[in-house]
């Protein structure tokens, strides 16, 4: 089973919620935690892992043999990722945009396109207590994460529970959606300012025809705008996690919330039960 955690903004507490659920279930299931917040991997702050494997993901990106290039512009026209630029009658390549498909060279009549290696990112595999932890981190200059995704996908445990912490913001959701999650957990703080991104996430997941539910994190005592919206539009609320000063100020380690008090453990147990209920429908 694959459960993906997504959010519309940074600093919502998505990683905290995902890590706590994985930590709660580590002794009950064979849990693998995937930190797929590829531009800003930070789950190890909560799950300080001992790494046992590290793999560089290398793709082949084009380079131009200028002695052979006749400036036909076939490469510029055929590449949908904008790797090739025509600048003052010279073809410039942007390797950080490349997906490594190799399509461009088949359209070069002069055989002027060769390839060179480019480090797209790294994948680390380790453990923390009973958890398997995988971290996917993209090169800071890279734009396309496809090959990083394919290599991450191969590490999913088909017989266990895979908890995936996705990158915030809609532009990155293709990365986690391509992992084909069984269930999406949308983490929100319930505020009005987040409604635009929240609605866009809901629409994308509905178009994928995947079950999902909403967790309202850092909830205040009064009813939030998004809570009202969910109830009025029959969107399932999985849980409401309260705002507590001790948690926000760091007086308790975030990954130990499920052991911090019986109250927090019960909240996360209820969250897991609600996920199972929604998946089974």
Please state what every model-predicted region is:
Residues 1-26:
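Walker A (P-loop) phosphate-binding motif
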Residues 3, 204-281:
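C-terminal lobe/tail of nucleotide-utilizing enzymes
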Residues 21, 25, 48-71, 82-100, ...:
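Ferredoxin-like iron-sulfur electron-transfer modules
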Residues 29-44, 117-123:
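Short beta-strand-centered segment that lines the nucleotide-binding/catalytic pocket of NTP-utilizing
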Residues 36-37, 135-144, 149-174:
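Switch II (G3) loop of P-loop NTPases
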Residues 74-92, 103-119:
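Iron-sulfur cluster-binding cysteine motifs and their immediate structural context
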Residues 171-192, 198:
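Inter-motif core of Ras-like GTPase G domains
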